[in-house]
Amino acid sequence: NLKTFLSQQNEFTDYDFEGSGMSTLLDVLAYNTHYLGYNANMLANEMYLDSADLRSSVVSLAKQVGYTPTSCTSSTATIDVLVSPASGASLTMSRGTKFSTTVDGQSYSFVNNADVSITPTDGVYKFSNLKIHEGSYLNYKYTVSTSDIDQRFIIPNDSVDTTTLTVKIQESSSDATTNTYTLASGITGLDSTSKVYFLQEVEGGRFEVYFGDGVLGKAVADGNIVILDYINTNRDAPNGATSFTLSGTVGGFSSATITTISNASGGTGLESIASIKYNAPRDYSAQDRAVTAEDYKTLVKSLYANAQAVQVYGGEDAETP
């Protein structure tokens, strides 16, 4: 121990190691050693997916096997919208048209995520089986500066539904030409002209958009404007909404009768740490294939993040009649 070791050193032959002063110093050294050992143990735990506790560590380790945790997902509902009175050869419901509902005394807004046009049938203007998403549309822009080596394109909200994310690149502030980029699902087939973007979860549960390096995916240029358009959600709170009213207008008309086809459902928060630990190695082993039962289970869970349980079996497991 420390007392025995120090008492055997020539420099401390005249010291009384039973004295209160020396005992206090030895206690400090012992405590320091204990805490260093504890910190080293905790640090070692965070180095492995199985034992990591911090979300940032789990996300980083999952990234090493090419797995991106799923974002929050917006609650969705399906409705029929009968607009009356209305006129014209056609009627267009603009993207972002708002519908309101109330769940447990709290008001929420739903929006449609694409322009929808219809023509009247026997004079009736009806949008059938319209899918609406809970949340509000937000827009964020970055101007690319290649001289800033630390520049990042982070979506500044932690409840974004990345499935609704639209990424566009405007040439410059003086050139309004824009190109829409798509989410890269892999690197196969990518080249220097591929207009794709990549996603990764970063600190605070937010998501970062990044682009190719000019070899795997087209690189952004100095002065380009990155436009991020997305829905920010209230996670699972609006699930169960049953009735909706039109908050905005449809083609300038504000009177509408709304029938709910399916109640609001599917809203979720960020993928849990336990789910990331389970899915990351299986997603890596599946390699986007659908061959084994485990492959199918992994793919289904990645497509339907709100699924509470997935059961898969192959014909080889079925009992012979």
Annotate each PLM feature.
Residues N1-P321:
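Signature of Asx- and small-polar-rich beta-strand/turn repeats characteristic
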